[in-house]
Amino acid sequence: MFPTACRHHQDTPDQRTPCAATIAPENTMASVDSCIKYGVGNIECDVCISKDSVFYILHDSTLDRTTNGTGAISQWLSTDIDTLDAGSWFAPRFAGQRVLRLTDLLRKAKEHGLRITIDYRNGSLQQLLNLIKDEGMLENCNFTFSKEQHAKCFRKMAPEVRTLQAYIKSEKDIEHVVKELHPDIAVVWIDSLTPQFVKRCREHNLQVLALVLGPDDKTEENQKAVDLGVDIIATDHPEKFIMKYGKPSI
């Protein structure tokens, strides 16, 4: 069965709402627990750093939208971030949920046999790698970078890691991305996914991760990804996917 990757948020044209949006607030342990409940094999998260160099899980660069704090997380000390309420905005029953530290997420994932996809935002790459290694989770993490130079730097720092993801817009971009970044996993939007795209990725020994994201019904798109034999399907609604296809294997 296809592993499913669940984000800690989902994107729409007008707003950002949490992964499994009817279940739990993003960037919290409650969100992780909901993924565990539904058997999600891989949790994608955005990693950013505090003023005192502690890594947190937060999609936005600021705390305003999902906590009772304001301003950039990079200007906050971890001792203060840890006091913020990251759940009340979503529903009263989640009052008191905290912004999730990467360390706590890694430990929870290790306990439950989950993979974590790290979407790097800022902070020391070496510090990030050391933290993941210290928690014994390097072999259970995927890595993705929005900036090409960060991906290249990461590849040089950790050549042994075989889970570097790279966004590829279309089939014609595969050669360039492979040459420049040497990725292990091709990430592609479902609308750009074709049989030839998958074939070319296989020729380069790339796994394929299909992005099937958004708030609307994705039944047809999910089936397309399954039929084309992708390795991972990223979804904002893991509970619906698993209801149809069953719990994934990691």
Positions of predicted regions on the chain:
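Phosphate-group recognition and catalysis centered on beta-loop-alpha active-site segments
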Residues: 1-250
